[in-house]
């Protein structure tokens, strides 16, 4: 299985060079464009050049190709958006999430869902009685070089409005759709920044109607029952655990920048972590040895800034008790009964089964009178 469509803000500087002015404006409007990955891989495998994106791979009429012929079909009742991490070229993003989609398809079938990644698959997509989950990707300008960590983080933050525009646009076309975001590594940093900026009203999505405005309301301002994202899966998140916490005991008041976005705009978030993640261990060393040392040097002149502290990664640790109540953590090592490294999440059956279970639960009404128990691999309550 290969994911057919990726939305991306890669190579924007060369976008629309071979099209007329109106088409170019339309392609630039939302901060991302759609790419036919079948055509892109034909280019990449022929040239082995990941640095270029020929005009022929860009979908000029995405409304017809991506939406009318795929995502807007009545049979499609859920959409998964996968977004990758640091040091991932475009073809690498496709490979990783196609592996995940392939594994997830079998797991979801046990729950009577059919995952579809290409409208040309042998599935009756016009049958509205089908219960289809469409899988698309979102790729941001990760440089694909090991030494570009900081520049990738900058690109990651700058890509947040584009991802928000994508989700908002999907919701304008299918108001009742359930949207699940699966982010790996630094992709979680991107999603968390998007949520932070939305809840703080740093920007608004380009496509914004009353229904979406309600989804963007904080719970304490009337947004109790609708959410911008239904389920958010964080695989090996390259996010500081203190960034998702709220500390207000005694004299140590601190609210992490991502706390409110996760609390108010996502119905449930699920963190999958492993203490054997070598990439995140290296990231912790880099932040501790370089970034925090430089920051504390600056603070000799500017005074302390508690927002700029680095402690340990969320992807290496159990979820802190100070995180929002709608965020849950899952120990990937316990789930799989083996050591899980940074790239092992995409096709580990036990992890994928857990994701499928959570998606299934998102579409099942719970009965609160039933007794609860706790999974050994999660702090998530389960029905007996």
From Swiss-Prot:
Keyword DNA-binding found: no
Whether Ligase counts among this entry's keywords is: no
InterPro entries on file: AB_hydrolase_fold, DUF900_hydrolase
Alphabetical list of Gene3D superfamilies matching this protein: alpha/beta hydrolase (3.40.50.1820)
Alphabetic keyword roster: Nitrogen fixation
- Which SUPFAM superfamilies does the record match to this protein? alpha/beta-Hydrolases (SSF53474)
A GO biological process of this protein is: nitrogen fixation
Q: What is this protein called?
A: Uncharacterized protein alr1448
């Amino acid at each position: 299985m290969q994911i057919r469509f990726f939305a991306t803000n890669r190579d924007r500087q060369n976008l629309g060079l071979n099209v007329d002015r109106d088409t170019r404006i339309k392609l630039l409007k939302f901060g991302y464009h759609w790419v036919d990955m079948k055509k892109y891989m034909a280019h990449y495998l022929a040239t082995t050049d990941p640095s270029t994106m020929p005009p022929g791979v860009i979908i000029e009429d995405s409304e017809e190709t991506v939406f009318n012929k795929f995502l807007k079909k009545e049979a499609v009742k859920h959409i998964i958006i996968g977004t990758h991490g640091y040091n991932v070229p475009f073809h690498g993003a496709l490979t990783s999430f196609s592996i995940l989609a392939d594994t997830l398809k079998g797991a979801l079938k046990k729950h009577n869902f059919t995952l579809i990644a290409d409208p040309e698959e042998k599935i009756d997509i016009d049958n509205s009685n089908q219960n289809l989950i469409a899988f698309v990707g979102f790729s941001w300008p990760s440089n694909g070089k090991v030494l570009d960590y900081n520049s990738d983080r900058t690109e990651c933050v700058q890509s947040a409005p584009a991802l928000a525009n994508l989700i908002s646009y999907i919701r304008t076309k299918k108001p009742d759709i359930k949207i699940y975001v699966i982010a790996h590594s630094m992709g979680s940093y991107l999603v968390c920044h998007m949520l932070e900026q939305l809840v703080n009203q740093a920007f608004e999505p380009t496509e914004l109607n009353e229904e979406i405005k309600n989804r963007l309301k904080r719970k304490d301002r009337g947004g109790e029952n609708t959410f911008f994202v239904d389920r958010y899966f964080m695989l090996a998140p390259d996010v500081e655990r203190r960034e998702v916490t709220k500390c207000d005991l005694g004299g140590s008041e601190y609210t992490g920048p991502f706390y409110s976005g996760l609390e108010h705009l996502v119905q449930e978030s699920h963190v999958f972590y492993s203490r054997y993640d070598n990439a995140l261990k290296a990231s912790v060393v880099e932040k501790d040895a370089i970034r925090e040392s430089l920051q504390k040097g600056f603070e000799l002149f500017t005074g302390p800034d508690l927002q700029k502290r680095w402690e340990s990664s969320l992807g290496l640790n159990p979820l802190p008790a100070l995180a929002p109540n709608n965020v849950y953590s899952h120990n990937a090592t316990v789930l799989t009964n083996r050591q899980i490294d940074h790239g092992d999440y995409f096709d580990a059956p036990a992890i994928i089964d857990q994701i499928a279970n959570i998606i299934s639960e998102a579409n099942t009404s719970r009965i609160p009178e039933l007794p609860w128990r706790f999974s050994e691999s999660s702090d998530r309550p389960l029905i007996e």
